[in-house]
Amino acid sequence: MNTTERTMAAATLRLEDSRVTGPDSLRVSRLPAADKGGKWEICGICDGIEPAAFNRLKALLDAGKREEAWEGCLQYVLDNTAAVRSWLGSDAYPGVEFILRDHFFNSGSRNTGKILQRALNVHGAGLTVDGIPGKQTRQ
């Protein structure tokens, strides 16, 4: 994980829980009753959607391994949004990459792919908006 990726992942985590600024403030939060992600989360990593990741991170926090839990959260965000880099074809546009990664983390691949395709179509790309970025999207 390079410095730019680390910064992007940390910003995504902060957007998920504004009280978290790093390992010392990392916490388990109760989700609202209407939330479909489960009952608990750690910076958007929910027990109902990603139980294995949530349980691993919670166990680290319970054991007092805050730094390791923070690194695990950062890596989780990067691993789960890695497709965005392949869509863009490089790391040359970190601002665009960040916005797409953050959206991907919250809305998934297909919705984020559609946003990218629609944005490119505004500039004349003529892409089919199917949410599956491929070779034409990268061009």
Model-derived regions, located:
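Cell-wall polysaccharide-cleaving catalytic domain and substrate-binding groove, primarily
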Residues: 1-139
